[in-house]
A protein has these predicted regions:
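Generic N-terminal targeting/processing segments that precede catalytic cores or assembly contacts
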Residues: 1-388
Length: 388
């Protein structure tokens, strides 16, 4: 059965909902682990005032009993505490009080095109759903996908490798142990010196009323070879990873392995040579492909990078047009963050976890998690899989 993850809710509405459907029964979930993932999404130097209001916690309203999944859809809810300050403006039902419409779309946001597409006169009807606040629901759902993957021996991590012009040294030798303390960095960067430079860059540009983008990297370890397929374009795992990560607000580019870098080197330097011995089975000494060849996982660590643009909500707004009068105006001023690349990495983990969980469900099925494990073990035996 295919796995689905659906979210609902607006940024300043009563709350956010996530429905995850397609996971087997018998999977153990830890409430504290789910809440830790939500807390991680709120990390990062450069966050705005809303993080002082929201202390995200997940409430499970379906699909789980006594800490185990039932095989039915899993319903997760995250309350928006800030709704108390927006109750009249964001009420689902008509209110007596007058609420002013927003007519000033922000360049780089969904505001203008959203009002055109859906025939709306109030930009808030677009921006509330388009907001990255929606990713809290994705992280809640992704945390369940992570639990499923962990039950099958797969772990997913992320770290920040660039903020504007500050880039951390490249590391190709990372292991799961290297990520144990990544969240201790205020920008979730593994390099101490790069962390200091990134923090300084955020502080410098924030004083200039600027926002900052950057690049985060997601790595998955313990992934079995053969997830995805070469036979149909829509089953190619690299395509599915790209779509999932590009769906995150403000993400503009995705690369797998060496990505765009291979366009500038000859073929002998672009691919991973294949070797074999009795102890290791098939193996590669390099991982330029990032764990994906021909639309399928190779069994090497999955390495995916996503590039995030600076946030379009600026404290010094860009030029825009009032959609009610068509007169020139400054774009909407809205409470915002300066830099959310560290948090976006956590969202990236959730989306990669969802894609991998769906791939495992598609390939190994199972009504109960034990059925899935048995199918996975049989597959590993058939292909002579050795852990890497």
């Amino acid at each position: 059965m295919a796995l689905t993850l659906t979210t609902a809710g607006e940024s300043h509405g009563p709350g956010l909902t996530c429905i995850v459907e397609g996971l087997p029964a018998g999977l153990e979930l830890d409430r504290d682990a789910l809440n830790r993932e939500l807390a991680r999404r709120q990390l990062g130097h450069g966050r705005g005032g809303r993080m002082k209001i929201e202390k995200d916690q997940v409430t499970v309203t379906g699909g789980v009993r006594h800490g185990r999944t039932l095989g039915s859809p899993i319903a997760l809810q995250v309350v928006n505490r800030d709704y108390a300050n927006w109750e009249e403006r964001m009420s689902p039902w008509p209110v007596d009080a007058a609420t002013a419409e927003v007519h000033l779309p922000r360049p780089g946001h969904a505001d203008l095109v959203g009002t055109q597409k859906y025939g709306l006169t109030d930009v808030r009807d677009v921006l509330e759903r388009a907001s990255a606040r929606e990713t809290a629901a994705r992280v809640a759902g992704g945390s369940v996908c992570k639990a499923y993957l962990q039950a099958l021996g797969v772990t997913v991590f992320s770290h920040v490798i660039q903020i504007t012009g500050v880039t951390a040294p490249r590391r190709d030798d990372l292991t799961p142990e290297d990520f144990e303390h990544v969240d201790d960095s205020p920008v979730r960067c593994l390099d101490v010196e790069a962390t200091k430079a990134m923090v300084a860059e955020i502080d410098r540009l924030r004083k200039q009323n600027e926002s900052l983008g950057g690049v985060f990297e997601v790595r998955a370890f313990g992934v079995v070879p053969g997830l995805g397929s070469h036979v149909s374009w829509e089953e190619r795992l690299d395509g599915r990873l790209g779509q999932a990560l590009l769906s995150i607000q403000a993400i503009k580019a995705v690369s797998i392995g060496d990505g765009a870098e291979v366009a500038g080197v000859p073929g002998s330097q672009a691919h991973d040579e294949i070797f074999f011995d009795e102890q290791r089975g098939y193996y590669r000494e390099t991982n330029r492909a990032g764990g994906v060849e021909g639309g399928m996982t190779t069994g090497d660590p999955l390495v995916v990078r996503a590039s995030m643009k600076p946030l379009p909500t600026l404290t010094k707004p860009l030029r825009s047009v009032d959609i009610a009068t068509h007169e020139p105006a400054e774009a909407l001023r809205e409470r915002t963050d300066s830099c959310t690349v560290p948090a976006a990495g956590v969202v990236g983990e959730a989306m990669v976890a969802f894609v991998l969980a769906d791939a495992y469900r598609t390939k190994f099925g199972g009504d109960h998690i034990d059925d899935t494990r048995a199918a996975l073990d049989a597959y590993k035996l058939r292909i002579g899989y050795r852990p890497r």
